[in-house]
């Protein structure tokens, strides 16, 4: 079977928070990328998000923080951590930090992640590949020149100047080096 082939500046494996944010930042600077995501679509699980101050700053720079739906976010200035039974262990008070990021932002499941993925699709149409599995790196001598993958079960070869492994703690990209 002939292997499909594409060329891009950056190939990113993993469309979680790190990979998707990187791809969006690159797209906003005119850098072409392809993001391979093993899942068949955006995350749907019940996974709430807490945006820490630095994460809020990143979303703000991407132009997304103020676009999160108001009904799906809440600012929290203080967290109390307690033992089972109620004894307080410690308190984290975000109001001691400088504004405007002197809070944590708690969201309904996947709100921030979906906002990032939606913005990425608009900024880089066709650059986010679901049902795409990394199968190996491509080398020219000792230099990485891209990757091999399957997309919807079909083999594909990606040539790129840079490959980023944003595929988590058990990274297949890292294992391939």
Each predicted region: which residue ranges?
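Flavin (primarily FAD) binding-site architecture
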Residues: 165-177
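Active-site-adjacent segment of FAD-dependent monooxygenases/related oxidoreductases
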Residues: 52-119
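Conserved Rossmann-like nucleotide-cofactor binding loop
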Residues: 18, 41, 170
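Glycine-rich FAD pyrophosphate-binding loop
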Residues: 27-47
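Core beta-strand elements of the Rossmann-like FAD/NAD(P) dinucleotide-binding domain
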Residues: 6-8, 153-162
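A conserved short coil-to-beta-strand element within the FAD-binding core of flavoproteins
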Residues: 130-144
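Beta1/beta-strand and adjacent pyrophosphate-binding region of the FAD-binding site
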Residues: 2-18
């Amino acid at each position: 079977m002939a292997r499909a082939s594409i060329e891009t500046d950056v190939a990113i494996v993993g469309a979680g928070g790190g990979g998707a944010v990187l791809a969006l930042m690159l797209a906003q600077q005119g850098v072409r990328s392809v993001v391979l995501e093993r899942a068949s679509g955006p995350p749907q699980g019940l996974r709430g998000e807490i945006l820490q101050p630095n994460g809020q700053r990143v979303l703000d720079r991407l132009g997304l923080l103020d676009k999160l739906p108001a009904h799906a976010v809440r600012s929290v200035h203080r967290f109390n951590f307690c033992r089972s039974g109620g004894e307080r262990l410690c308190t984290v008070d975000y109001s001691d930090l400088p504004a405007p990021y002197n809070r944590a932002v708690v969201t309904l499941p996947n709100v921030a992640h979906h906002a990032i993925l939606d913005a990425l699709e608009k900024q880089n149409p066709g650059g986010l590949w679901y049902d795409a599995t990394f199968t190996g790196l491509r080398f020219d001598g000792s230099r990485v020149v891209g990757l091999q993958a399957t997309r919807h079960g079909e083999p594909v070869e990606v040539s790129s100047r840079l490959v980023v492994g944003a595929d988590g703690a058990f990274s297949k990209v890292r294992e391939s080096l």
